Design a protein with these regions (language model features):
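NAD(P)-dependent short-chain dehydrogenase/reductase
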Residues: 200-248, 253-261
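C-terminal amphipathic/interface module of NAD(P)-dependent oxidoreductases
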Residues: 361-417
Length: 417
């Protein structure tokens, strides 16, 4: 075992990805649940941290209350912690609120990453920064607006002008390609602008840093779309869900395991340097709308209910939307079953009207192509790869449906007991 010690700082540790990173520590070769404890004696000034005794990797996990990235003394705090790697999971994620509070969004999403980048460059530390698919605008908006206009008529075509992904693919017989790192970023919202500014300022200050763009994160932690839909499907007779925004749902624990693989690689390298730098995309494979995502959630939950329920109990079929809507938006697989909840597709504009409040604009199409990152990691020497138990499938490069199934079934949820 190498004698080199690598200290890893996780910022925003109370958030969804931060919790996923900590929950997946036991899957690392260097860790086991019985060896994990919640204090670093060498860094007693930092509470709420974890270390594997006897290993050469130390984890310092801090939430906003423990480490405010917008504070004037950030550099001094970072120097006290003295990390070799910083994983920046902290972010201002209130997309709609950012429209009214751009200063707060810029402070955490743009200025803080730049300050982290400068400190890491000066100290020779590696920075991994998490960004968002919302840095993109309507890359395919005009194209699909024309398609809908030709098929459904001008008025409906204009109304659905930003629809892309599965609906258009069903008509064209050819799904649009996912977005690559070289596609033009034109964020529509102030939140997206703040995230793009953070990427640009960070990489300008520290070209050796790594930016990971991801999309539609969900997990068993915090508040997210899957947990919300899982609850609402049992509470409401009808759910109206946006069908004209297309992206890729991504399991935060799959992203966490990818990051740990990169960190093991960094730790085992003989020289202290970044293993990857620049901007890369990570998401599950495939694409869907929020409406199709909700249908898949309902279907998978219903299957679980059927598998666990006595054979005498019949499942209640899901109520479908109107025929014209269902033809346009429904997946090819059978309608999901859930206790009597009707799932209806609506446009972004219709959903905004239902909320009766202003919404920040969202990209109509933001599915991410992860092939560049996959190729880069395929070149990783096999001895550096973080392994998983042989009977557990690695979730990193799975489809969004397969990742969702793992999350909902509870697989890949290691216990720290």
């Amino acid at each position: 075992v190498t004698a080199k010690t690598t200290r890893i700082l996780i910022t925003g540790a109370h958030g969804q990805l931060g919790q996923a990173l900590l929950a997946n520590l036991p899957w690392l070769p260097e860790f086991s649940p019985s060896r994990l404890r919640m204090k670093i004696p060498e860094v007693s000034l930092v509470p709420g941290s974890a270390v594997a005794p006897g290993s050469a990797i130390e984890i310092v996990a801090l939430g906003h209350q423990q480490l405010d990235l917008t504070s004037a003394d950030l550099s001094e705090r970072l120097s006290e912690i003295n990390a070799d790697v910083i994983i920046n999971c902290a972010a201002y994620n209130a997309v709609d609120a950012a429209e009214q509070d751009m200063a707060a969004a810029m402070a955490l999403n743009a200025e803080a990453p730049e300050r982290l980048a400068i400190w890491c460059r000066q100290r020779g530390a590696w920075l991994i920064h998490i960004s968002s698919d919302y840095v993109f605008g309507n890359v395919f908006g005009n194209v699909f607006g024309n398609v809908f206009g030709n098929v459904f008529g001008k008025d409906l075509g204009n109304a659905l002008g930003n629809v892309s992904g599965n609906a258009a693919a069903n008509m064209l017989g050819n799904a649009p390609r996912a977005l690559t790192e070289s596609d033009v970023c034109e964020p529509l919202s102030l939140y997206g602008q703040s995230k793009l500014a953070g990427e640009q300022r960070l990489l300008k200050a520290n070209p050796g840093a790594l930016v990971l763009r991801t999309s539609w994160l969900y997990s068993r932690f915090g508040s997210n779309f899957v947990l919300t839909m899982r609850r609402l499907l049992t509470e409401r007779p009808e759910l109206k869900v946006v069908a004209d925004q297309i992206g890729t749902p991504t399991w935060a624990e799959a992203l966490a395991r990818l990051i740990w693989q990169l960190l093991i690689w960094f730790h085992l390298k003989p020289e202290k340097s970044a293993v990857l730098s620049g901007c890369f995309h990570y998401a599950a494979t495939g694409q869907c709308s929020w409406y199709l995502f909700t249908q898949e959630i309902a279907e998978q939950i219903a299957k679980q209910q059927c598998n666990s329920a006595p054979s005498s109990q019949a499942a209640v079929p899901l109520q479908t939307a109107s025929p014209s809507q269902a033809t346009l938006h429904s997946p090819a697989n059978p309608a999901p079953i859930t206790p009597g909840c009707r799932i209806t597709p609506v446009s972004t504009a219709e959903y905004g009207a239902l909320l009766n409040r202003a919404q920040a604009p969202r990209p109509a199409y933001s599915a991410l192509d992860s092939s560049a990152l996959k190729d880069a990691m395929a070149a990783m020497p096999s001895a550096f790869r973080c392994y998983l138990p042989k009977d557990y499938p690695s979730p990193i490069w799975l489809s969004w449906q397969a990742q969702l199934a793992l999350m909902l079934s509870g697989l890949g949820a290691p216990s720290l007991d």
